[in-house]
Amino acid sequence: MSKTAYVFPGQGAQFVGMGKELYENHPLAKELFEKANDILGFRITDIMFAGTDEELKQTKVTQPALFLHSVIRALCLGDEFQPDMVAGHSLGEFSALVAAGALSFEDGLRLVSKRALAMQEACEANPGTMAAILGLPDEKVVEILKTIEGGVVIAANFNCPGQLVISGDVDAVDRACEALKEAGAKRALRLNVGGAFHSPLMEPARVALAEAIEATEFHTPRCPIYQNVPAHAVNCTHGIKKNLIAQLTAPVRWTESVQAMVADGATRFIEVGPGAVLQGLVKKIAPAVETEGKQ
């Protein structure tokens, strides 16, 4: 039997105006956005709907904004939202957990806000960067990264075959980019990000978030969630918490996650939230599946 997977995007999909149409047309959306303003202690809706790109790009704003857009969109689907499985890319994992009933809306938002602030502090304490690498097999990239001496640099996002992101110390990432270009990478491009996400440089954030996650009540999700760290289905709350904590310093194994969902019967992938990045990645990983978006 064919199954439907709902997937939730991470940082990078944000744009000014996101969520405005939902707010204006759905009473439930308006109620949840206003609740979010109260929980966060500032009017995030003002920045989302009519702020500047610079305001929206602040990590403490971007992460809650993306979470809110995706989760509220999913909740507004009502009975139409019938996932057989869910997954989220990086930050999107929190959206997926709330949509699947493993976390309450309020607790999910508090954790995402905590995650954003902890990551911001880790970026300031341990400056780093990330770079997109295109046109080399994943194994080749990993092999070359092992030869880079001095500093931290690891494969951080396995997005789709031939497209991954590396993360680490600025100098080590720059040297890795040169080595990867020499090895035949079509592109090795530094990204405009605030730090070395999904690398050991995020350890202070992992410690801070671990405490908050352990203190939060999680529930068994209504369907399996395919988490970034193990890249397979997880149902138990203990495992979900452990993987959420590990995710901050571990790679996002998106390619393997999508492959696992397809192996378990997914033939239709619906991206919930701004943009269509995940639909593009899913099509590159599994060309035979159907994709659509709910923005």
Feature map (PLM): residue ranges:
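A short, flexible low-complexity segment enriched in Lys/Arg and Gly/Pro that occurs
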Residues: A65-S70, A246-W254
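A short, acidic, amphipathic alpha-helical segment used as a generic capping/interface helix at domain edges
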Residues: P251-A266
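FabD-like malonyl-/acyl-CoA
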Residues: S2-V141, L191, R268-K294
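Non-catalytic positions within long, well-ordered alpha-helices that form the structural scaffold/packing
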Residues: G78, K181, V262-G265
